[in-house]
């Protein structure tokens, strides 16, 4: 029965949805990808959030252009996490982005694919994230690598509250070291409303009319990587 379910076609995509960069190497843990954008959009739109985060380590497989099966979606999100909506401050969002980009240009499962916001990582600034012996966030002890954080086209206000959609692993359990979140530090507005792969299916079927189209052909320029040598969006820098 499960085999039949996995083969069931749930939607279509006109573009290949990928975890890889232009060079064919895995990128979702260190750069924006079109599948990362899609997964983050699904959380933000379905939960009605200002911002959504998806950890790159939770985006596990590509989807080739053509039919999308239930199995394809499960392969993308195989962990069975559940969608949550929480209230956080701009400072918590900024600290999360800083933790997510701490390992860059190296990979991190906690690298954040985002929706509803854009930001720049300045790779020339060394990370000053302090972690405890469990690799959990403690504080930022120096200059931030992340800047130009815009939410819905407006500069992030560290003192303002925003609604943030993601899964229980990050928002409630403070997974991947995201101790600025966790049940002690966030106000839960919607608690484990839907399993992660269903979030993705529902977004494509209900909000995109069952077809992932050209708007997801390439990364949408949400994350810009800045170095002394370049000042281009991540999807462009892959080609240099």
Name each model-derived stretch:
Residues 1-240:
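Catalytic centers of hydrolytic enzymes
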